[in-house]
Swiss-Prot record:
Name by which UniProt lists this protein: Histidinol-phosphate aminotransferase
SUPFAM superfamilies: PLP-dependent transferases
GO biological process: L-histidine biosynthetic process
E.C. number: 2.6.1.9
Gene Ontology molecular function terms on file: histidinol-phosphate transaminase activity; pyridoxal phosphate binding
Record HAMAP family: HisC_aminotrans_2 (MF_01023)
PANTHER family, A to Z: HISTIDINOL-PHOSPHATE AMINOTRANSFERASE (PTHR42885:SF2), HISTIDINOL-PHOSPHATE AMINOTRANSFERASE-RELATED (PTHR42885)
Modified positions (N6-(pyridoxal phosphate)lysine) in chain numbering: K233
Keyword entries, A-Z: Amino-acid biosynthesis, Aminotransferase, Histidine biosynthesis, Pyridoxal phosphate, Transferase
Pfam families tied to this protein: Aminotran_1_2
Tagged with keyword Amino-acid biosynthesis: yes
InterPro entries: Aminotrans_II_pyridoxalP_BS, Aminotransferase_I/II_large, HisP_aminotrans, PyrdxlP-dep_Trfase, PyrdxlP-dep_Trfase_major, PyrdxlP-dep_Trfase_small
Length: 389
């Protein structure tokens, strides 16, 4: 049976969370934290800056923000949801990258434990693993549908007790494809009684899928499930760097004990509070515009002579298309030349992804505004035709 304490590193199990006087006393004459009581050194601060009390350390717990995130996610719960979330299920980080790194540090002993990924996938998993001296194992996604290979994953983790984390990106990056929810449920249930490890589902692009696709509302049912989210994509708030980890209350306690006490700034939380309440309608409008433009852009790209197939799916705010050479074959050489010419000659920056597994000739294109997309399509066709003359 799964036991979270069996995979937490021994030094984390005995960790005493950082506490400060402000945890117990929040009002009055506050002379406990060596802050500058005169205020922020900002010329003529505006009302917002004054209200945020930027000379004070931010709230280390962010309970109001956590509850708003929960309220938002529980509007469209996963169809398998049986239990409500609480603020004890959440840990906030400086972007999802902090959450990725924190999970590695929480459960993987450097030089001993391993992490399993399913390429093609997000590159930060491997970077964080390497930094933490954690061995990387791989089970590729199936092709051409970019779904998880359940038998291969089960075989891998059951045969190697040192694998402590399985990272899945859903919707995928660079694939743009949602992993079948039932497939992940199958893994969770199959491994719950025979594997001491965590299945981490990174849902950075989840708001571009059908409502109810998120697995975040299932973490109380599956103690071996962790879900990562961000406000960077659908909410258009990449600049505030806010990542959200949903997990069991027990695991969340350890993650919150590990994190730096004031990791979420007052500026970040102020913006996030507005976005996850008053900004929901705006976010949904943005998502609608992006998905509409995504379909238009993809249709036009696929009509071009030297563009092959849509390599990935349509569950994100980007497309991944296959660039062909003049013989009609997928070509990394042509894709790289197109990428470089667009960037240096036309000031249009896309992303070369042809080096990723099963993505030969791949260019990943984020969906911009209608005007940006028109310019992209014009220059993409012209430059690609010139290359293949």
């Amino acid at each position: 049976m799964f036991d979270i304490k069996s995979i937490i590193r021994p030094n984390i199990l005995t960790l005493e969370p950082y506490r400060c006087a402000r945890d117990d006393f929040k009002t009055g004459i506050l002379l406990d934290a060596n802050e500058n009581t005169h205020g922020p050194a900002i010329p003529t601060p505006d009302e917002t800056e004054l209200a945020l009390e930027l000379n004070r350390y931010p709230d280390p717990h962010q309970l109001e923000l956590k509850q708003q995130v929960i309220d938002f996610r529980e509007k469209h719960p996963n169809k398998y949801t049986k239990e409500k979330l609480s603020v004890e299920n959440l840990c906030l980080g400086v972007g999802s990258d902090e959450s990725i790194d924190m999970l590695l540090r929480c459960v993987c002993v450097p030089g001993k434990d391993k992490m399993l990924i399913c390429p093609p996938t997000y590159g930060m998993y491997s970077i964080c693993a390497t930094v933490n001296d954690v061995v990387i194992e791989k089970v590729p996604l199936t092709v051409p549908d970019f779904q998880i290979d359940i038998p291969a994953i089960l075989s891998k983790v059951k045969s190697d007790p040192n694998i402590k984390l399985l990272y899945l990106t859903s919707p995928g990056n660079p694939t743009g494809k949602l992993i079948n929810v039932d497939s992940i449920i199958t893994l969770l249930e199959e491994l719950l009684n025979c594997w001491q490890g965590l299945i981490v589902v990174d849902e950075a692009y989840i708001d571009f899928t059908e409502p109810g696709s998120s697995m975040s509302t299932l973490v109380n049912q599956y103690p071996n499930l962790v879900v990562l989210q961000t406000l960077s994509k659908s909410f258009g708030l990449a600049g505030i760097r806010l990542g959200i980890t949903f997990c069991s209350k027990e695991l969340s306690w350890y993650l919150n004990a590990m994190k730096y006490p004031y990791n979420i700034s007052s500026l970040t939380s102020n913006v996030a509070l507005k976005a996850t309440k008053q900004g929901l309608e705006i976010m949904e409008n943005y998502v609608s515009k992006i998905t509409e433009q995504r379909d238009i852009v993809l249709q036009k790209l696929l009509s071009l002579k030297y563009v092959g197939r849509n390599i990935g799916g349509l569950d994100s705010n980007f497309v991944l298309v296959e660039v062909l050479d003049k013989q009609g074959n997928p070509s990394n050489e042509v894709a790289k030349q197109l990428y470089n010419t667009l960037a240096t000659g036309k000031s249009i920056v896309v992303r070369f992804r042809g080096s990723e597994l099963n993505c030969v000739g791949g260019l990943r294109i984020s969906i911009g505004t209608e005007e940006e997309n028109k310019q992209l399509l014009e220059q993409f066709e012209a430059v690609l035709n010139d290359i293949n003359q």
